Amino acid sequence: MSTTTEILAHHWAFGLFLIIAVGLCVFMLTGGFLLGGRAKGRAKNVPYESGIDSVGSARLRLSAKFYLVAMFFVIFDVEALYLYAWAVSIKESGWIGFIEATIFILVLLAGLIYLVRVGALDWTPVRSKRQVVKSDIINTTNNHPQ
């Protein structure tokens, strides 16, 4: 038997699964396109407000910093899930598991320190931070004659 025939003999079920999955996706997308209604009015892209006329724009612009902090949160949150799984199995893992978790926490801490040092968690860019000069400091001593 040739190599190609052996590969097909071992993986025919996976190939059939891929063909059926792609065919089902194409069928559903084509069916939705052919059977779906077409809205041709001006109000097609206006959000539904329960019969009340819309006021203003429905779009909310968020700073790119929000998405950056959200990504950092997701990354560190997933790593916290790994620590939770370690905490559940702490009796089985013993001292070796404790040392591995300590190294993992130190790597997380190094990543957090790096993010702080780079300024990735600062909300305002450096150019917009106001520099404190001597004239901005309020004089707390009373120089008025009494």
Curated annotation (Swiss-Prot):
GO terms for cellular component: NADH dehydrogenase complex; plasma membrane. Keywords: Cell inner membrane, Cell membrane, Membrane, NAD, Quinone, Translocase, Transmembrane, Transmembrane helix, Transport, Ubiquinone. The chain crosses the membrane at residues 14-34, 68-88, 96-116. One of its GO terms (molecular function) is NADH:ubiquinone reductase (non-electrogenic) activity. The lineage of its organism: Bacteria, Pseudomonadati, Pseudomonadota, Gammaproteobacteria, Enterobacterales. It catalyses: a quinone + NADH + 5 H(+)(in) = a quinol + NAD(+) + 4 H(+)(out). Signal peptide: none annotated. This is NADH-quinone oxidoreductase subunit A. Its EC number is 7.1.1.-. Its main location: membrane. It is found in: Cell inner membrane. NDH-1 is composed of 13 different subunits. Subunits NuoA, H, J, K, L, M, N constitute the membrane sector of the complex. NDH-1 shuttles electrons from NADH, via FMN and iron-sulfur (Fe-S) centers, to quinones in the respiratory chain. The immediate electron acceptor for the enzyme in this species is believed to be ubiquinone. Couples the redox reaction to proton translocation (for every two electrons transferred, four hydrogen ions are translocated across the cytoplasmic membrane), and thus conserves the redox energy in a proton gradient. InterPro entries: NAD(P)H_OxRDtase_bac/plastid, NADH_UbQ/plastoQ_OxRdtase_su3, NDAH_ubi_oxred_su3_sf. It comes from Pectobacterium carotovorum subsp. carotovorum. It is a multi-pass membrane protein. Belongs to the complex I subunit 3 family.
